[in-house]
């Protein structure tokens, strides 16, 4: 519908979520189930997210009473962060991980089990022990599947999903004054019409900006839209270099190279340069190949370092 100013308005919602990856869909489903009216705005199909491309898994200690395991996870994270981590945030995320993983399981995510019936825990870079929940090497796709189905269950009641709609900009309550917050978002419909989506709360869950780099394992939608909208609205931006960065990929001339899961290093893969590999093949009979890896110069964990 159009208002007296000629703007085309969507129905007001309690929460507008921009993005349909694990963060956006999880929040949208939880809010809808609590009785809030929610709209998810996603510029491609709902499953087109970086979450869907993620392979390895999710780190967490499922038993909240395993204090030693939790503390080990905290130490590993702080060590991997090289002094850049906010310890309070690290402890909060790791402590709450068990609840969030159980929530995902409750939403239908099927993590792999071992022959004993427990979860098949893997090791990845930076971890000193096996604490990675995974679904084969397609964990992200499994999470996206489950959350998409959970969202579909809510679409007839409190949840609306706007696929192929592009969030253009945040609507500030007072233009030029970020302290007053936002009152909605302008969206571009598939037909090229700009609509106003009024909302009590707007959540930016738009993922990373991998496409700004020459090579990235992110999908083509990772263009930093949410960060740009937040910046234009006066929000403080920090730590951009750490968003959605994956360290290992198969080299090619393709601008989006094939992602190599961190789980390979957990299973013993060694990071080596071509020269190091050649030296080991020529002179390394009987020598542990990890001794030739450049990673021994940077981390006591060798190829598991981050």
Please tell me what each predicted stretch does.
Residues 60-93:
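Glycine-rich active-site loop/strand segments that organize a redox cofactor
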Residues 105-193, 198, 205, 249-252, ...:
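Conserved redox-cofactor binding core of oxidoreductases
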Residues 33-54, 65:
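Glycine-rich FAD pyrophosphate-binding loop
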Residues 15-40:
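N-terminal Rossmann-like FAD-binding beta1-loop-alpha1 element of flavoenzymes
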Residues 1-15, 33, 180, 193:
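Extreme N-terminal leader/targeting segments of oxidoreductases
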Residues 201-258:
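Glycine-rich loop(s) and the adjacent beta-strand/alpha-helix scaffold that form part
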Residues 235-306:
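An anion/pyrophosphate-binding glycine-rich loop and adjacent beta-alpha core
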Residues 80-121:
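Rossmann-like flavin
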């Amino acid at each position: 519908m159009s208002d007296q100013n000629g703007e085309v308005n969507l129905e007001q919602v309690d929460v507008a979520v921009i993005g349909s990856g694990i963060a956006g869909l999880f929040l949208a489903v939880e809010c809808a189930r609590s009785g809030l009216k929610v709209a998810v705005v996603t510029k491609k199909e709902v499953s087109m997210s970086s979450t869907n491309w993620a392979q390895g898994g999710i780190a967490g200690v499922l038993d909240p009473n395993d204090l030693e395991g939790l503390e080990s996870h905290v130490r590993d994270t702080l060590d991997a962060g090289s002094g850049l981590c906010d310890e309070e945030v690290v402890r909060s995320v790791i402590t709450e991980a068990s609840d969030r993983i159980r929530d995902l399981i409750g939403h239908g995510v099927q993590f792999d089990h071992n022959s004993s019936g427990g979860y098949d825990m893997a090791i990845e870079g930076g971890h000193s022990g096996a604490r990675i929940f995974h679904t084969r090497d397609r964990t992200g796709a499994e999470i996206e599947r489950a959350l998409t189905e959970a969202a579909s269950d809510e679409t007839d009641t409190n949840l609306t999903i706007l696929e192929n709609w592009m969030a253009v900009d945040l609507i500030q309550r007072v233009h030029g004054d970020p302290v007053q917050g936002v009152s909605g978002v302008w969206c571009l419909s598939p037909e090229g019409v700009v609509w106003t989506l009024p909302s009590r709360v707007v959540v930016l869950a738009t993922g990373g900006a991998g496409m700004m780099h020459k090579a990235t394992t992110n999908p083509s939608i990772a263009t930093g839209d949410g960060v740009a909208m937040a910046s234009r609205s006066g929000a403080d931006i920090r730590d951009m270099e750490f968003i959605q960065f994956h360290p290992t990929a198969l080299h090619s001339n393709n601008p989006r190279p094939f992602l190599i899961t961190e789980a390979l290093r957990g299973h013993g893969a060694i990071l080596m340069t071509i020269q190091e590999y050649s030296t080991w093949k020529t002179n390394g009979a009987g020598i542990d190949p990890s001794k030739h890896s450049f990673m021994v110069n940077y981390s006591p964990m060798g190829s598991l370092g981050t």
